[in-house]
């Protein structure tokens, strides 16, 4: 129960920080059968019962045609709990296996196909938001992947609008630690569906970065949490994006630890922006 409350508080902070849920929302909760999506569904259902705003949750799973897919585990679990649930059958597995060479990871194409299906189903079900189960560790892993392999300073947005403008995607677990979600899933005995049914291997770059983060956190506890905090504590003038400088009206950076910064005298320095302010400035 203590772990459930801790995760609920972290999720609540994310929802509040990024205005993820509004009164009257109908949330499509994408449930893959993994620990994270089960946890997200359980926490959202709890929140819907006690939140000051009224919203509803419908769980959706996509049976993508993987051989031996045990979809009945999810169906039985949702029925036993009396949860609103839809199982959608779409054979994307044959498309992926046809397009992707043997021994290559299917994950990227599979994910894109699944996302497109979710967008369509959300419209059909009248859902105003789509909730995905990405967590803190996903966010910081993506940050490092982009830094190392793409030369970009970005993670995954906690809230985004789809290219077609019809769907808003939210990530309520973005402040939650993967280890705590795993412990919660074990505590609740969720009937987990394995993610390797297709036989595809995890992306090697992501696997390497995940291991790097695990090693760093073992040697320097709090590494992942500090990286998450950094994503919400941005100093644009200490970055090299000239377009960002122009949009924010920056002319020169301030020294670290300047008297103004230390004393907090006067108005906040324009180059010190919590992430919420940054997003509003760029909107």
Swiss-Prot record:
<feature type="binding site">
    <location>
        <position position="107"/>
    </location>
    <ligand>
        <name>[4Fe-4S] cluster</name>
    </ligand>
</feature>
<dbReference type="GO" id="GO:0051539">
    <property type="term" value="F:4 iron, 4 sulfur cluster binding"/>
</dbReference>
<dbReference type="GO" id="GO:0046872">
    <property type="term" value="F:metal ion binding"/>
</dbReference>
<keyword id="KW-0808">Transferase</keyword>
<comment type="subunit">
    <text>Homodimer.</text>
</comment>
<dbReference type="GO" id="GO:0005524">
    <property type="term" value="F:ATP binding"/>
</dbReference>
<keyword id="KW-0479">Metal-binding</keyword>
<dbReference type="InterPro" id="IPR011063">
    <property type="entry name" value="TilS/TtcA_N"/>
</dbReference>
<keyword id="KW-0547">Nucleotide-binding</keyword>
<dbReference type="GO" id="GO:0016740">
    <property type="term" value="F:transferase activity"/>
</dbReference>
<feature type="binding site">
    <location>
        <position position="110"/>
    </location>
    <ligand>
        <name>[4Fe-4S] cluster</name>
    </ligand>
</feature>
<dbReference type="GO" id="GO:0006400">
    <property type="term" value="P:tRNA modification"/>
</dbReference>
<dbReference type="InterPro" id="IPR012089">
    <property type="entry name" value="tRNA_Cyd_32_2_STrfase"/>
</dbReference>
<keyword id="KW-0067">ATP-binding</keyword>
<comment type="similarity">
    <text>Belongs to the TtcA family.</text>
</comment>
<keyword id="KW-0408">Iron</keyword>
<keyword id="KW-0819">tRNA processing</keyword>
<dbReference type="Pfam" id="PF01171">
    <property type="entry name" value="ATP_bind_3"/>
</dbReference>
<comment type="pathway">
    <text>tRNA modification.</text>
</comment>
<keyword id="KW-0411">Iron-sulfur</keyword>
<dbReference type="GO" id="GO:0005737">
    <property type="term" value="C:cytoplasm"/>
</dbReference>
<dbReference type="InterPro" id="IPR035107">
    <property type="entry name" value="tRNA_thiolation_TtcA_Ctu1"/>
</dbReference>
<protein>
    <recommendedName>
        <fullName>tRNA-cytidine(32) 2-sulfurtransferase</fullName>
        <ecNumber>2.8.1.-</ecNumber>
    </recommendedName>
</protein>
<keyword id="KW-0963">Cytoplasm</keyword>
<dbReference type="InterPro" id="IPR014729">
    <property type="entry name" value="Rossmann-like_a/b/a_fold"/>
</dbReference>
<feature type="binding site">
    <location>
        <position position="198"/>
    </location>
    <ligand>
        <name>[4Fe-4S] cluster</name>
    </ligand>
</feature>
<comment type="function">
    <text>Catalyzes the ATP-dependent 2-thiolation of cytidine in position 32 of tRNA, to form 2-thiocytidine (s(2)C32). The sulfur atoms are provided by the cysteine/cysteine desulfurase (IscS) system.</text>
</comment>
<keyword id="KW-0694">RNA-binding</keyword>
<feature type="short sequence motif" description="PP-loop motif">
    <location>
        <begin position="32"/>
        <end position="37"/>
    </location>
</feature>
<keyword id="KW-0820">tRNA-binding</keyword>
<keyword id="KW-0004">4Fe-4S</keyword>
<dbReference type="GO" id="GO:0000049">
    <property type="term" value="F:tRNA binding"/>
</dbReference>
<keyword id="KW-0460">Magnesium</keyword>
């Amino acid at each position: 129960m203590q772990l459930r409350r801790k995760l609920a508080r972290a999720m609540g902070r994310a929802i509040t920080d990024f205005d993820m849920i509004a009164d009257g929302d109908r949330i499509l909760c994408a449930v893959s059968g993994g620990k994270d999506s089960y946890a997200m569904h359980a926490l959202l259902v709890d929140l819907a019962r006690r939140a000051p705003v009224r919203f509803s949750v419908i769980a959706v799973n996509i049976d993508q045609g993987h051989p031996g897919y045990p979809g009945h585990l999810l169906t039985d679990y949702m029925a036993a709990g009396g949860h609103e649930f839809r199982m959608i059958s779409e054979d994307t597995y044959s498309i992926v296996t046809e397009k992707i060479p043997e021994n290559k990871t299917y994950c990227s194409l599979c994910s894109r196909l699944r996302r497109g299906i979710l967008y369509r189903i959300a419209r059909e079900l009248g859902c105003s938001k789509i909730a995905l189960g990405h967590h803190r560790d996903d966010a910081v892993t993506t940050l490092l992947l982009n830094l190392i392999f793409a030369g970009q300073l970005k993670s995954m947005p906690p809230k985004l609008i789809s290219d077609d403008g019809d769907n808003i995607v939210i990530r309520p677990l973005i402040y939650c630690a993967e280890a705590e979600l795993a412990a919660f899933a074990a505590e609740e005995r969720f009937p987990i569906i394995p993610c390797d049914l297709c036989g595809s291997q995890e992306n090697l770059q992501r696997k390497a970065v995940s291991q790097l983060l695990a090693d760093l956190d073992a040697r320097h506890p709090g590494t992942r949490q500090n990286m998450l905090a950094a994503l919400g504590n941005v100093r644009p003038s200490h970055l090299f994006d000239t377009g960002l400088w122009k949009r924010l009206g920056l002319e020169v950076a301030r020294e670290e630890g300047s008297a103004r910064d230390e004393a907090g005298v006067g108005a906040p320095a324009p180059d010190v922006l919590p992430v919420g302010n940054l997003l509003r400035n760029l909107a």
